[in-house]
């Protein structure tokens, strides 16, 4: 696995009323600090890629549908430079995926329905100076 990437398996607690699933807690080893939470979606078969952040950690959790998330480590000096990781996240694999700064990432919705991804990131989005480098 790419250096700095972490996976947290999530527990789903079902009962006769429905389900509860904790995503992140303040005391999780995987989670260094709070910046903001946002929801992004992907339509079936659509790819959103490639970009990285200079400072920000992302924590992806797909809560509806399924997505394939791909990571690429291009960091100079990283013991895993050049490594590619693929993860499947969603209703059938409830995990949080931590993506460290400077690791390229993108995702594709798989299956026949729109997928919902929650990201709990460590930086607040700055519209005047985004911490985001995209490959076009």
Predicted features by range, described:
Residues 1-93, 110-134:
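Non-catalytic, conserved peripheral segments adjacent to functional cores
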Residues 97, 105-110:
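Short beta-strand His + acidic residue motifs that chelate non-heme Fe in jelly-roll/DSBH
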């Amino acid at each position: 696995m790419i250096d700095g990437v972490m996976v947290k398996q999530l527990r789903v607690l079902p009962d006769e009323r429905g389900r509860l699933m904790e995503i992140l807690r303040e005391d999780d080893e995987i989670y260094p600090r709070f910046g903001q939470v946002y929801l992004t979606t992907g339509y079936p078969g659509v790819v959103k890629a490639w970009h990285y952040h200079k400072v920000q950690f992302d924590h992806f959790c797909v809560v509806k549908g399924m997505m394939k998330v791909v990571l690429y480590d291009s960091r100079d000096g990283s013991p895993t430079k050049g490594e590619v990781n693929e993860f499947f996240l969603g209703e059938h694999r409830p995990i949080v995926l931590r993506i460290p700064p400077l690791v390229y990432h993108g995702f594709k919705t798989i299956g026949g329905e729109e997928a919902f991804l929650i990201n709990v990131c460590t930086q607040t989005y700055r519209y005047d100076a985004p911490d985001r480098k995209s490959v076009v």
